[in-house]
Amino acid sequence: MTSDQDAKVVAEPQAQRVQEGKDSSHLMNGPISQTTSQTRSLPALTQVPTTKVSELNPNAKVWGTHMLHLEASSAAVGVNAAWEEAPGHPTDCDQQVLGLDANGDGDKSRENAALPDAQEAEQTDMSTLALDHSEYEPLPENNDTGGNESQPESQEDPREVLKKTLEFCLSRENLASDMYLISQMDSDQYVPITTVANLDHIKKLSTDVDLIVEVLRSLPLVQVDEKGEKVRPNQNRCIVILREISESTPVEEVEALFKGDNLPKFINCEFAYNDNWFITFETEADAQQAYKYLREEVRTFQGKPIKARIKAKAIAINTFLPKNGFRPLDMNLYTQQRYATSFYLPPVYSPQQQFPLYSLITPQTWSTTHSYLDPPLVTPFPSTGFINGFTSPTFKPATSPLTSLRQYPPRSRNPSKSHLRHAIPSTERGPGLLESPSIFNFTADRLINGVRSPQTRQAGQTRTRIQNPSAYAKREIGTGRVEPSSLESSPGLGRGRKNSFGYRKKREEKFTSSQTQSPTPPKPPSPSFELGLSNFPPLPGAAGNLKTEDLFENRLSSLIIGSSKERNLSTDASTNTVPVVGPREPSVPAPCAVSAAFERSPSPVHLPEDPKVAEKQRETQSVDRLPSTPTTTACKSVQVNGAATELRKPSYAEICQRTSKDPSSSSPLQPPKEQKPSTVACGKEEKQLSEPVERHREPPALKSTPGVPKDQRRQPGRRASPPAAGKRLSKEQNTPPKSPQ
């Protein structure tokens, strides 16, 4: 009966408090449910009267041990005052507990509990009710009492906390950094109270605007307007400023201004700066009284009107300082750190190859307009060599052939000196470009009038390159690009791979042709037209020829751009063609006379040429707009043919390359190009001459060609020959003709 009643009694308060306790009361026995209820109440109350629960069931011998724990940690005397029970039962419990304390035996307590079981059955029921209610009801009672006790504290604490918080928010120290409150101020430094009440840390304390206004009015450092809508920091206006009073003024005279009977006493009078004097008073009212006295009664000082004003303690607004303590400091540190990473970190942390790369790339995040080679970005880095090393393998090899190719059009337009200056630095950079001049062969042939085949030009290239290597270094230094040759040789070789096979063929042909030409060098070339006109006296029967040569030079300059270049070509042509005629007409001493005899005199060798020359003259007269003497028309026809050949430059160069395999076929192809400016063999009549005449001319032509192609080779292909070498060779060719004359 008691266990069932105990289960019911324990289940009722648990159903009110915790649903889980009800389930446990149905599932468990009475003493177990009682123990659960006791254990729940133990940490909160440490109640001693719960020892009575062990006496409810005679089988509950185990709970005597827990009584000892309760006694050890119990405060029985203090808790008894809060119980709502009959006074007899707690005293019994206390006596039993004291008995336990005195004896220290749980068996005695259980015997004492078993003796009055029949008498105390009803009392135990009531006591269990009281105990259960004492287990659960005192908790809300204590909570209520604690809440009732803490509520006045909480009402006082939030008020004090709110007072301190508002005082801090409107203090001058905070307003110096709180940009939000400063932005909400009007001209009189008033801030709406609603703005202050909406601050987060004030909302947490209170949302009652009336309470906030009341607290603000109680603050001594804050001034609230009459309506209670605005608040501002207290204007500490205790200093009167006197302006435009010199520093040399005695302090006694300034103090005498404020020694009237009705004036309050000032605390301090001192010269501040810039002819300003500060007079400090105790309160703002004293300062106001002194200010009115000066403005209304004194008015003048040292014969000048007094300029006085009250100095309010200004709020030191630092826009660059933090708003709320640490945050803007962190922001400033962050901005400085980000600024430092782009400029100072690369020299500090990096070797020369890692961080400059990143710093070249990272500035694009904060300045997108800069390229990575912009000088202001490059200068902070100590390793400019790395930057050159970074760009040279990717860009410089590509730009160096491009720059050399860009120089081709001016070469084709300008005189020969410009070829010497522009061509050499582009090709003499590295051994790769020197070893592969085929990169530029075809472009040079097409751009420079197709005067000389690439076969003969390459022979001159190798010779002149070997002759004057020091000029290349000077020219390279002049260009300002001193770079490793390996970086540029590789792209040069890479570009020359397309023509490398043809270039090998050309070199083989070049060496074979030079070997065939080299054994017969003894015949010296004859002088040029310029030497004949300027240096030699007129020979017998050559006066008319000189005039025709002058006329030919004028028409040559009018037709072809760059007359000086063509005159150089004409000198080379004369050196080639005159020795051809030399062995057949030994009686003619001068080249001019030879040319006259070749064109006009009925020599037995040239008789078969005359009708062909006449036919060619008829054709050219129909084409030419300036008909003149047969000599001039023949020379003009040469220029017309030369112009036609210039229009067909690419195909003609290809023809030269195809036919250059035969020295016999290449030698007749060369004289037409050489004889464009010359009057000896006009135009392409050399091609139309009979084969015996051509074969008769071949050995002297081969004798003269080894030197001649080198001159004309340098004019189109100046990239391989320095200027000094070209000048020396031209002098060597022009000087020997003086000996036979």
UniProtKB/Swiss-Prot annotation:
- Segments of skewed composition (Polar residues): 31-41, 142-153, 452-470, 628-642, 732-741
Main function = Stimulates mRNA translation.
Quaternary structure, per UniProt, is: Interacts with PABPC1. Interacts with RACK1. Associates with polysomes via the 40S ribosomal subunit.
RRM domain mapped to chain residues:
242-309
Provide the species name: Mus musculus
Q: Which residues carry this modification: N-acetylmethionine?
A: M1
Q: What high-level taxonomic lineage is stated for the organism?
A: Eukaryota, Metazoa, Chordata, Craniata, Vertebrata
Kindly provide the name given to this protein in its UniProt entry: La-related protein 4B
Membrane spanning segments where? none
Spell out which residues are annotated as carrying Omega-N-methylarginine: R406, R421, R495
Which GO terms of the cellular component aspect does the record hold? cytoplasmic stress granule; cytosol
Write down which residues bear the modification named Phosphothreonine: T520, T735
Q: Which residues carry this modification: Phosphoserine?
A: S246, S426, S436, S453, S490, S500, S526, S558, S570, S603, S667, S721, S730, S739
Q: Which residues carry this modification: N6-acetyllysine?
A: K727
**Domain HTH La-type RNA-binding residues, every copy:** 152-241
Q: Which residues does the annotated region (Disordered) include?
A: 1-45, 86-160, 398-436, 451-542, 567-586, 599-741
What intrachain disulfides are recorded? Answer: none
Q: Does the keyword Acyltransferase apply?
A: no
Sorted keywords for this record are:
Acetylation, Cytoplasm, Methylation, Phosphoprotein, RNA-binding, Translation regulation
